[in-house]
Each structure stands twice: as structure tokens, then as C-alpha cells.
Amino acid sequence: MKSCEVNFDGLVGPTHNYGGLSYGNVASQSNSQQCSNPREAALQGLAKMKALMDMGFTQGVLAPQERPDVASLRQLGFTGSDEQVIEKAARQDMPLLVASCSASSMWVANAATVSPSADTADGRVHFTAANLNCKYHRSIEHPTTSRVLGAMFADAKHFAHHPALPSVAQFGDEGAANHTRFCQDYGQAGVEFFVFGRSAFDTRYAAPQKYPARQTLEASRAVARLHGLSDECVVYGQQNPAVIDQGVFHNDVIAVGNGEVLFYHEDAFLHTEQMLGELRDKLSRAGGQLQAVCVPRAEVSVQDAVRSYLFNSQLLSRPDGSMLLIVPQECQANANVWGYLQRLIADAGPVAEVKVFDLKQSMQNGGGPACLRLRVALNETELAAVNPGVIMTAPLYETLTQWVDRHYRDRMSENDLADPRLLTECRTALDELTQILKLGAVYPFQLN
């Protein structure tokens, strides 16, 4: 039976704004308080989805969250009607309103960790929603994330869903942004690579000094257990604390993997050779052969990697066995990075082509092509069991672009978040979206 990897891209929500909420994310902090353009952001994301679909890749879409999150504001003591809750939050504690309006759920690489059926003990695709407990504005996402994923992958015969891990620092889990799967073929058993930034309970592990390590070893181990993964198909690697302190807040900012290829920066990991040896050994036993493509710091610095998001790219397998690298246009604007990419293609290695996309609205908030997608490897039977409403087609693309044009503003400042009309606009848009994507009731305002 044939299998493929499906990229489910996050649809940017109507409240996309530059709140500067993500300490440790250089782009997020440096663009704080600028005016954003939610309409442009959503259309840029949809254009990437359409382009990949046109290239022959199976492409899906993942719905945004309800924002402003009035229910979360009520939990924090704001009372009255929904409009009064927003007005009080704006007057008494504007940072909380900004956090409750974040459109960060567009970066669905953090939505969950996914293990395909070829790796799991019960032969089902397993999903664990990420608790994202390091940042308040993201920690409130996982209940809706779980409902949306449940509506997309509803058939319990093929799909298993786990709630987020306990929302405490010891089990900080950032989802697929710190998880890569290596395999000879998507339908065969592979090796799942979990990258962590620190250990919560074992002081022998190093930790960053400036910025937080968002993923713990304990969280990664818990997800592997929940998914029924054997020790033979799991490798744990530690991210270099020094690069976390340079703004590499997730592993997908310094490395990307697909198939048998790991594309990574020389400074990405601790104990790199030992880690690569374990990956090679376990992948070999699964029938694959690891190809490690290391980018030397002498050619691309960590600073250039963070500025350009070279590694926050999509590495996609083409039918002829070669690979395509999807990068943001910031890579083209960086002479060191673009020079390296030209040499990479010329070297006749696994990466045969680079395609550039304009994702400026997302990039300015700290998220590139890889942040915007959740990868799910599916066989033909499983793909047929996915809610068809979330699989991108030419008609769906047209419907969604028209939906964005109808409902999204072209300018969003901090003051706009306090506009009581914004709540009505967003709920109207999302209510229509759940009908377009055939999700049913997934948002708090639809459930209450």
C-alpha cells in the first residue's frame, strides 16, 4: 500500500498581530508593536498551500483558534458580557488582552507530535497535542487543538488522540517542532528523533543560560510512551544550549529532516557524533541509510541561520527520489545563506532544488515555512479516512481566499484588539470556516 506525507498548514487567524509575546524568539521580539496585516498573512499562507498542491504534494489545512479567547480572560477574573470582558481587559491589563488575541496557532508545527501507524504498537496514527506551557498565549491552545485534530482525524480505527501532557515546566512540550521522523519509505517503520533542550529531573544535562529551553527530555519520553514506540525506533538528541541562547527556540530553527536526510547546522546539537551514530544504526536496522548534511558554521553562522530561517524550511520528497527545499525569501536576501544554497544544489546531493516563498507576515512574528505545517504520514486507507473537507483542492483554495477577503482586516494594531467589533467579526468568520472545512462545533463559542 502506498503512503505519503501530508503537510497540514495552519491557516492564519483574523487577529494576527505583532504582540512580541515570545521571549527567546528574536523575530517576535524585534517586531513587537508593529502593525500587522492579517489578510496578507492568511493569503501568503494559502498561496504556499496552493503552490505545493500544484506541485503534486498532498496538502491539508488546519483551522485557526478562536481569538480573542474570552473564556481564558474569564478564568483570569474578568467578568460581564463578552464585550465587557474585552473592554475591562484592555483597560486593566492590556498585555493579557494581547496574549488572548494571539494568532500563534498558525504555527501548527507546535500543535502536536504525530507518529505514523508503521511505528506504533497498535498500528494507528497517534497524535499528542502539545501543552506549550512555556508561554501563556500558547498554553491556552491545546484544548481547541485537540478538538480540531479530532474532527480532522475522527476514525478511531485509524487514529488515536492523546490529551496534552501536564501543563508544568517539567513536561514542557512544543510538539513536532522538536520531532523528526526518518525512514526509507513513509509506509515502513522508521526512526523517530526527539530533540530536547533540557532535562527537568537530571542535573547532569546542560541547559541554556539566557533563553528558556522549552522542550524537556521527560516530555519527549512521555510522548514516545503514549504513542507506543519501541526503543528501537526512537532516538533522543539534545539541542545545543548555546544556540538556544542565540535565538534557536525550537529544533526546527536549526535542523530539518525528511526521509533518510538530516539537514542541520554544525552547532545544532550536543554530542553530535554519538547522536548521528545512533540514528544511523537504528535507521539501518529499519532498512534505511542516513544522509547527514551538515552546514558548517564557517559558511553560515547561527546568527545568519536565525535571521534567514534557513532550517525552518520544508524538505520534501519528490517522485524521482530527489528532494525539494522550501525556504522563505529571507534566505535569498542573505548573501551567506543564498550562496550556501547555490553550492548545496550544485553538489549533486539529496537536495536538488530550492523554491522561495514570501511569508513575510509570519516571518516577522518568528515563524517560517516549517513552523506553518504539521506533517502526517498516512497510507492510502488512512488518507481516505481523513475528513475530506480539510484536504486542499483548487475549489477549496478559491473558497478560502474569498473567505479571507470577506472577513479579514488589512491592518491590526494593539489598539484594534480592544475593538468590540473584532470579536463578532472573528466568530462570524470562524463559524463559516467550520462549515467550509466540515469540522462541526470545535470553538468555545459554538459549544456554549
UniProtKB/Swiss-Prot annotation:
Catalytic activity annotation: N(2)-succinyl-L-arginine + 2 H2O + 2 H(+) = N(2)-succinyl-L-ornithine + 2 NH4(+) + CO2
UniProt keyword list: Arginine metabolism, Hydrolase
Enzyme class label: hydrolase
Cysteine pairs bridged by disulfides in the record: none
SUPFAM superfamilies per the UniProt record, alphabetical: Pentein (SSF55909)
Sequence positions that bind substrate: 19-28, 110, 137-138, 214, 252, 365
GO molecular function, one term: N-succinylarginine dihydrolase activity
Pathway(s) where this gene product acts: Amino-acid degradation; L-arginine degradation via AST pathway; L-glutamate and succinate from L-arginine: step 2/5
Pfam family, one: AstB
Function summary: Catalyzes the hydrolysis of N(2)-succinylarginine into N(2)-succinylornithine, ammonia and CO(2).
Family stated for the protein in its record: Belongs to the succinylarginine dihydrolase family.
Quaternary structure annotation from Swiss-Prot or TrEMBL: Homodimer.
Designated name of the protein: N-succinylarginine dihydrolase
Species in which this protein is naturally found: Pseudomonas syringae pv. tomato (strain ATCC BAA-871 / DC3000)
Phylogenetic lineage: Bacteria, Pseudomonadati, Pseudomonadota, Gammaproteobacteria, Pseudomonadales
